[in-house]
C-alpha cells in the first residue's frame, strides 16, 4: 500500500523503515495521506487539510482513559449488545476493528477480544497503540491478556478463526449523509484513508457461522440493516443501533 511516510525529529532512527517493511507500506511523496512517526506515537494525517490534525491510537490516556474510568462500563450500549451479564463475559471477535475503541471498552470490562483489521495503515496504528498500552503499568497486565490484533481481512479470516468466539462484532464504515458534512474531524481523516466498506454485506453470514452465540452489528440510525437482513432484536441509542443476530451453536 502506498502512503507518504514521514518521521519527526526525536523519533527512533530507522524505526520508520522497519515499520514500512513490516506492514508492506511504500513511500509516495505525493500521497495526500501521511503516516507520521513522532517521538510519542504513530499518527495518520491528511496533508491537504492540516487543520484536521492527526489520528493515533491511545489506550492509556485521553478520551479512552476517560471512557474507561468514567464511562458506563457494563452499562455501555456495546457491552449490553454483546450480552455481558453477571459473570458472563463473552469471548469476542471484533471483525472491523477500526481505531479499537469498542474493542477496548469490551476488554476493559473483562471480555477477551481479538481485533481483525485488514487495512495495513490502520493495523499499524492499532499495533502502535497496543505496544504502548501493553507497556503501561496501570493497564498493561490485563490489556495483554484481553486485547489482541490480527492483521487480516474479515472476509476470509472469519472462516479460519479458532477457537470460535461467542460473539462477532461488526461496525463497518458507512457513508455519512450529506447534511452530516461536519463529521468529526477524526472521522474525516479516517474515511479519507479507508472509504466505506462496500463489501461489508459479505461479512454477516460468515460472522453468523463463526459466532456461537450472537453477531452484533453497529449501524447509524439511518442505515439499512447489514445485507438487508432485518432483525427484531436491537439496542437503540442516540444516533445508532446495535442489531443482534443469532450465531451458530457449537455441536457436540
Curated annotation (Swiss-Prot):
Disulphide connectivity of cysteines: none
Binding site for S-adenosyl-L-methionine: 101-102, 117-118, 153-154, 171
InterPro entries per record: 16SrRNA_methylTrfase_J, SAM-dependent_MTases_sf
Subcellular location, principal: cytoplasm
Pfam families: SAM_MT
Catalytic activity: guanosine(1516) in 16S rRNA + S-adenosyl-L-methionine = N(2)-methylguanosine(1516) in 16S rRNA + S-adenosyl-L-homocysteine + H(+)
Gene3D superfamilies: Vaccinia Virus protein VP39, YhiQ-like domain
Documented EC number(s): 2.1.1.242
Enzymatic class: transferase
Transmembrane segments: none
Family annotation (NCBIfam families): PRK10742.1
Function noted in UniProt: Specifically methylates the guanosine in position 1516 of 16S rRNA.
Name of the molecule in the record: Ribosomal RNA small subunit methyltransferase J
Species of the source: Salmonella paratyphi B (strain ATCC BAA-1250 / SPB7)
The gene coding this protein: rsmJ
Amino acid at each position: 500500500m502506498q502512503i507518504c511516510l514521514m518521521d519527526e525529529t526525536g523519533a527512533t532512527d530507522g524505526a520508520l523503515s522497519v515499520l514500512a517493511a513490516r506492514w508492506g507500506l511504500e513511500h509516495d511523496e505525493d500521497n495526500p495521506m501521511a503516516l507520521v512517526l513522532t517521538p510519542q506515537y504513530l499518527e495518520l494525517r491528511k496533508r491537504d487539510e492540516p487543520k484536521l490534525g492527526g489520528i493515533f491510537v491511545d489506550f492509556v490516556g485521553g478520551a479512552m482513559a476517560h471512557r474507561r474510568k468514567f464511562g458506563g462500563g457494563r452499562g455501555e450500549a456495546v457491552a449490553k449488545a454483546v450480552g455481558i451479564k453477571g459473570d458472563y463475559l463473552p469471548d469476542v471477535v471484533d471483525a472491523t476493528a477500526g481505531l479499537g475503541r469498542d474493542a477496548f471498552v469490551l476488554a476493559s470490562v473483562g471480555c477477551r477480544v481479538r481485533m481483525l483489521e485488514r487495512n495495513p495503515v490502520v493495523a499499524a496504528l492499532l499495533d502502535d497503540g497496543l505496544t504502548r498500552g501493553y507497556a503501561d503499568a496501570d493497564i498493561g497486565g490485563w490489556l495483554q491478556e484481553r486485547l489482541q490484533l490480527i492483521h487480516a481481512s474479515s472476509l476470509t479470516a472469519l472462516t479460519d478463526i479458532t477457537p470460535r468466539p461467542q460473539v462477532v462484532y461488526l461496525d463497518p464504515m458507512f457513508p455519512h449523509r450529506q447534511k452530516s458534512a461536519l463529521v468529526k474531524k477524526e472521522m474525516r481523516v479516517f474515511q479519507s484513508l479507508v472509504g466505506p466498506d462496500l463489501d461489508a454485506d459479505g461479512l454477516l453470514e460468515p460472522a453468523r457461522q463463526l459466532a456461537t452465540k450472537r453477531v452484533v452489528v453497529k449501524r447509524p440510525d439511518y442505515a439499512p440493516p447489514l445485507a438487508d437482513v432485518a432483525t427484531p432484536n436491537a439496542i437503540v441509542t442516540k444516533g445508532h443501533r446495535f442489531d443482534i443476530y443469532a450465531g451458530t451453536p457449537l455441536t457436540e
